[in-house]
């Protein structure tokens, strides 16, 4: 989405384009900026800008809205939130292992069972193009290959032919259309197909390393699947490519993706800075959780202790202990008005607050507080320090 230049943007407009209503020619003269498309490129700019202040490897996560000129429909938005996590300044494959673990941990915590983390490697795709003698058509080849699950083998063949890839070349690579089995079986199939490609064999070794490490560590709920047609972000990914699919039966596109980039900072003048990053499509994840009924029916209260309000003097006494509770890391609040006790207790019940504290005239005299456990109904008269220990 383009943004109009500040001030009198028409002052520098292409007069001819304006007169002829030629929007394509007019746009560059009135709009030099656009809404944020993703979080990866701004991150690369930040790293270059602050390269002398950062400690590498540098890790960060970022959650912000981004904008795309998409036609709005289920799972596609013009404005949506992305959550990115990146590590830059290391080419270690242990980072890939950790990012797969991160995906698995997050989706396990959300209760999403059966999430599939698909993985491929840019070097494997380069190897395919190399063995069929079409390295100069790598992008055309992989863009067509990436559509295999949508348009089928015949559709992919037709598109490759239309891009100038010969029928003989396609025939050489046809075995990848039938590549089936588990991760190890697919790897063995790749070895045969890419036996003459140095880049391809390097990609296979990287995939094997990641698979072996994760096999030894184990995943909680997700599964790792080798998808040799996966080609997202090919313009800047140089190694591992990742994409996360929603559980089977949920009609949704990818809910996450990422990969290894060896020179993304190069566009801003910092060469050879390797990194890897992944993204969570938050809005799509929300839709999946909603469809599967994984949102809780009631929101668990953050407040652990509610102090009833009996008047100004009592509230002042209560706030002294509330401050101590908060200092101890325990969420506490004072009911704002001296309403009827029944109303205040009902408020605590509806919000699921586990403890209620009564601080009336008697408690003030004794320098005590009455703590009520809302689940058991048990009441204890305690000093402020004893109360903190009891609810902490």
Where are these regions (language model features)?
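Polyanion/phosphate-binding surface patch
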Residues: 1-34
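Acidic, His- and aromatic-enriched active-site or binding-groove loops in soluble protein domains
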Residues: 1-9, 134-155, 246
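Positively charged, Gly/Ser-enriched RNA/tRNA-binding surfaces
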Residues: 21-30, 38-52, 59-112, 160-392
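Internal, well-ordered alpha-helical segments in soluble enzyme and binding-protein domains
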Residues: 99, 121-124, 144, 206
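Hydrophobic mid-domain F-helix/FG-region of cytochrome P450s
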Residues: 104-108, 123-132
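Short, surface-exposed recognition loops or helix-turn segments adjacent to catalytic cores
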Residues: 114-124, 141-142, 224-229
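Short acidic alpha-helix initiation/capping motifs at coil-to-helix transition points
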Residues: 117-120, 148-153, 202
């Amino acid at each position: 989405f383009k943004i109009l230049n500040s001030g009198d943007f028409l002052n520098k407009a292409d007069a001819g384009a304006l007169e002829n209503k030629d929007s394509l020619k007019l746009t560059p003269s009135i709009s030099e900026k656009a809404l944020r498309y993703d979080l990866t490129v701004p991150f690369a700019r930040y790293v270059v800008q602050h390269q002398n202040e950062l400690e590498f490897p540098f890790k960060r996560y970022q959650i912000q809205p981004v904008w795309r000129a998409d036609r709005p429909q289920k799972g596609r938005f013009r404005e949506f939130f992305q959550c990115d996590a990146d590590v830059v300044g290391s080419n270690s494959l242990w980072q890939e292992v950790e990012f797969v673990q991160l995906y698995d941990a997050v989706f396990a915590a959300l209760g999403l069972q059966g999430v599939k983390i698909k993985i491929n490697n840019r070097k494997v795709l380069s190897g395919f193009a190399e063995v069929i003698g079409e390295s100069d058509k790598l992008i055309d080849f992989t863009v067509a290959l990436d559509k295999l699950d949508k348009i089928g083998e015949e559709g992919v063949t037709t598109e490759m032919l239309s891009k100038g890839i010969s029928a003989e070349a396609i025939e050489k690579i046809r075995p990848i259309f039938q590549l089936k089995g588990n991760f190890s079986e697919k790897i063995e199939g790749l070895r045969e197909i890419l036996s003459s490609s140095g880049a391809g064999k390097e990609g296979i070794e990287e995939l094997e390393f990641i698979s072996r490490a994760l096999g030894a560590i184990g995943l909680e709920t997700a599964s790792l699947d080798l998808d040799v047609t996966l080609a997202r972000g090919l313009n800047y990914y140089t190694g591992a490519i990742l994409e996360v699919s929603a559980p089977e039966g949920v009609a949704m596109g990818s809910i996450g993706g990422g990969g290894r980039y060896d020179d993304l900072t190069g566009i801003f003048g910092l060469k050879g800075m390797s990194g890897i990053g992944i993204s969570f499509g938050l809005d799509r994840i929300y839709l999946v959780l909603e469809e599967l009924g994984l949102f809780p029916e009631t929101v668990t209260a953050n407040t652990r202790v509610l102090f009833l309000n009996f008047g100004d003097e009592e509230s002042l006494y209560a706030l002294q202990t509330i401050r101590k509770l908060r200092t101890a890391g325990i969420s506490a609040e004072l009911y704002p008005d001296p309403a009827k006790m029944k109303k205040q207790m009902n408020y605590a019940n509806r919000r699921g607050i586990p403890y209620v504290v009564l601080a009336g005239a008697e408690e003030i005299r004794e320098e005590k507080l009455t703590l009520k456990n809302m689940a058991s109904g048990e009441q204890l008269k305690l000093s402020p320090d004893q109360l903190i220990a009891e609810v902490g």
